[in-house]
Amino acid sequence: MGSHTLNAPVRVFSWTSRVFELVFLALLITFCVYFSKDKTDPSLAVYGGMSGCYNCDNGWNWHVLLMGIAFGIAMTESVLAFCSSSLRANGYAKWVHLAWQAIALILAAAGLASIIVAKNYSDSKHMYSVHAYCGVLTLALFVIQFFWGLCAFVLFRSRLSEATRYQMGTYHILLGKLTYYAGIGTCVNGFADMQMMMVDSGQPSYDSSTMAQSWAAVFLWFTSAAVFCAMTTSRTAEVVTDSEEKDAENNVAV
């Protein structure tokens, strides 16, 4: 079985995840930017719409948008960089991965700042929900795995032995996967929190703005599932290709 045959499922799952990404992004932008008032009762404010300023009571929608793009788009693309055979063959995968990771880190930092400012403005309580606790743990994992990989493969690469880089790389990959799925789970949990707040505030359960953020969470889950399939099939292709190369070397030796 040739490696090109095994790479076909990787490409399918990678592009499927990107389709889900685009749908998620469209729903996220629609929810955060378009919906700011309930369409049936203009006097009823809803949890959606960035009609206000950065630090106003409705400014926490920046948190939703920035964190959604950070983990739903940037982190997803950083993972998919290593599922691309062309990027890996040209040696660009590491740098594309690093670029998307840096973008995700900047967006996540801005998203954290926006929710702190918005909560301070509205005198809302901090750190009382499952979403908040999971968010802090996810960001801590993000920072650790980012600088771990940066030190191992960029800053101190020339000073580390190949064995050390391999060991550090193993932990970086493990932490990276954990961070990605922790981020997806935290985002989905955040959407669930919003849905409860929206319904509790009197907004209809099946209102268009309520459903927009609900389906955004669903497509974010679809995206992460497709990424998992892409990573799994990519690893399978690597193992089989390595096995074929070793068999070929043994045949030549014989």
Named regions from a protein language model:
Residues 2-254:
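Membrane-embedded alpha-helical bundles that constitute the cytochrome b-like, heme-associated redox core
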